[in-house]
Amino acid sequence: MTRLLRICGSVLLLSAIAAAPHALRAQSSTAPEVLLRLDDIGMNHSVNLAVEKVAATGMPFSVSLLFVCPWYQEAVEILKKYPNVTVGVHLALNSEWRNYRWGPVLGKGGVPSLVDSVGYFLPSVDAFLASKYDLGEVERELSAQVERALRSGLTITYVDAHMGMAEATPQLREVAERVAKKYGLGISTYFGESYFTLWGVPVASKKSALLQHLANARRDSVNLIEVHVAERTPEMEVIFDMNAPSQNTPDAGVVAHRKGELETMLSPELAEMVRSGKIRLVTYQQLVARVGVAGMRRPQ
């Protein structure tokens, strides 16, 4: 029954987009603007498959891609098929999963202050902040991640910070801003967005929390919704977050959280809100075109 509801929801959403191919023209211009940002694509196959399911609905949204991860190449292939998806670089300085680690694009020798003894990024925000990281190496590594993204053949529109790490101090934020400016990219949260994340919401409450938030969405700003999706696969069943122990609860775990957020994105209730014009979906491609990178403002 649940699967049937998800399928019906996807059909509703596809019908809505077919009836209004340019940015869902059937939606009211006075409806609150909502920007769905799906983070961590490229992390692994499970996340890539989940993002593709959302992309296949035709729903316009933005994705933040981890170009430091081995699975980013599959993510690139997937995203090239979906013009409804706007792509950003998920600037990474951490590798938080136990037994599944990654390191910098520039390698251990290129940025030695950013890695542990075997060349992986540090597992948590606290560990990174306590380390003797070099800001020059941070800038070189973040630039290398953007350059890898630009070479991928995807249109890259914006950057944001994986785990908030690249914006965790005023000095790190300045580095991230310089990198974005150098490549003419937008920065997520620099367009006056209000921010809501499903990340810490209990699994059973994710859908209701999102629907309630959207029902009360602001009309004086873009409503940014941060989402993390994944399919339930063996690799996701055993994954363990070394940065956020709250995600590793015995009754749920990371996979339950991310599968729950995928089901929320595919729910018939969300599809109906889009179809009926109660919300108007936008992406960072539209915000950059509207405001320009010169019009961005650092969030307060």
Q: What does each model-identified segment do?
A:
Residues 21-28:
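Boundary at the C-terminal end of the N-terminal hydrophobic targeting segment
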Residues 8-20:
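Bacterial N-terminal signal peptides
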Residues 102-129, 240-253:
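Active-site gating loops and adjacent loop-to-helix segments of metal-dependent hydrolytic enzymes
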Residues 132-218:
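Catalytic domains of cell-wall/extracellular-matrix polysaccharide-remodeling enzymes
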Residues 187-190, 245-300:
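C-terminal domain-boundary segment and adjacent tail
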Residues 29-98:
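Active-site beta->alpha N-cap acidic-glycine motif
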Residues 40, 87, 159, 225, ...:
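Conserved, mostly hydrophobic/aromatic
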Residues 51-57, 74-86, 103-116, 150-151, ...:
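Acidic (Asp/Glu)-rich catalytic clusters
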